Amino acid sequence: MKTGKFIVIEGLEGAGKSSTHQVVVNTLKEFGIHEVVFTREPGGTPLAEKLRYLIKHEVEELVTAKAELLMLYAARVQLVENVIKPALAQGKWVVGDRHDLSSQAYQGGGRGLDQHLMTTLKNAVLGDFKPDFTLYLDIEPEIGLARVRGRGELDRIEQQNLDFFHRTRARYLQLVQQDPNAVLINADQPIELVQQDIRKAVQKFIEENV
């Protein structure tokens, strides 16, 4: 049995990750790929969802940047080992809302955590496991945050200042440029053009890898 492929959707808040899922799924179906598993990070298992709550919501004490990072990796390893790897082994495709690139950008870039720590933790937890394909939806932080604020109450991460998101975006752009399996999508465009670019990118990946 062929193993499945792991596609990840990345981007800042308000970039349109949620609507991208359906475009990816529809494109996979066009190529006869119907067994698709959805994941989100942090989350995706009972333990990981509890950690998601602690990461996203205000709690009774200050959550340090390192504590936040460790909770994210604890949630990630649960999801990878208990959900993603088994699904891929069964030949299913996995479409993930965020993966390790988020931590590298948000905690490594936004929080400014030590790069040696980031790399060491990534290697210890994930080893050589990584997505087969990453769609990075690039958006100006001002535009993305305006969209998010229009939805209502903000979570703990969304409440960070604009400089935090500019640092996060800068790290995203740096890492995406270095990753041959990542594609940058201009999410500042009208939604129709964004979805068109996503469809083309996914089609190209399928044609080259299936």
Swiss-Prot record:
Its EC number is 2.7.4.9. This is Thymidylate kinase. HAMAP family: Thymidylate_kinase. Belongs to the thymidylate kinase family. Phosphorylation of dTMP to form dTDP in both de novo and salvage pathways of dTTP synthesis. Keywords: ATP-binding, Kinase, Nucleotide biosynthesis, Nucleotide-binding, Transferase. One of its GO terms (biological process) is dTDP biosynthetic process. Transmembrane segments: none annotated. It catalyses: dTMP + ATP = dTDP + ADP. The lineage of its organism: Bacteria, Pseudomonadati, Pseudomonadota, Gammaproteobacteria, Pasteurellales. It is an enzyme of class 2 (transferase). InterPro entries: P-loop_NTPase, Thymidylate_kin-like_dom, Thymidylate_kin_CS, Thymidylate_kinase. GO terms for molecular function: ATP binding; dTMP kinase activity.
